[in-house]
Amino acid sequence: PDYIDTKYHTAVCGRASINLDTFMASGEHVCELYARHAVSADVCIVEGMMGMFDGYDRSKGSSAEIAKVLHLPVVLVVNAKSAAYSLAAMIKGYMDFDPQVEVAGVIFNQVGGDRHEEMLREICEDLNILCFGCLRKYDVLKEESRHLGLDFSRKGKGSITKTMMKELEHQLDIELLLEMTRRSVNIPDKPERRK
């Protein structure tokens, strides 16, 4: 579980953020918790930790397992710094690695400029996967970390958060992301047991 990120989510969204964890809790509990909080939400976003398939035993307890338990589509956030078409091989690997995990699209970050963005969007076209946006490099958006998490002690967080939100609104296809969330998601009463 990550208690620092949930505090940040709560501060930005104005709504409590929770941990979903199949290492410390059963899949059934994760489904119940998600369903309980989803009832009163317009949109539910589940942030993964580490790499998508990184768990305590191969992919057990991973973000991919959470996506499978909850039957959620995955949006990959890919660091595109100093890379272009080679990322196609990596993204294709994520798409094909586990057929039970639906990789619905990609958000690229650390994008260098217009030409770099063009090259990254070509990857999505060639792989027939949605590109939800390309986030540019901005020094103003760099957050200092403290104990592996965001530093809440600095003053002026509100202006940084507003800058982040403006950039995200400009560089992400919010409508396309929201369209994906409108799909009917059937949260199973009892997820399949881990093997």
Segments from the language model and where they lie:
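ATP-dependent carboxylate-amine ligase catalytic core
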Residues: 1-70, 78-102, 114-118
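Short hydrophobic alpha-helical runs that function as membrane-insertion/retention elements
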Residues: 74-77, 132-134
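Conserved beta-strand segments of the P-loop GTPase G domain that flank and frequently precede/overlap
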Residues: 76-79, 107-109
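Internal gly/pro-rich beta-alpha loop/helix module
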Residues: 85-194
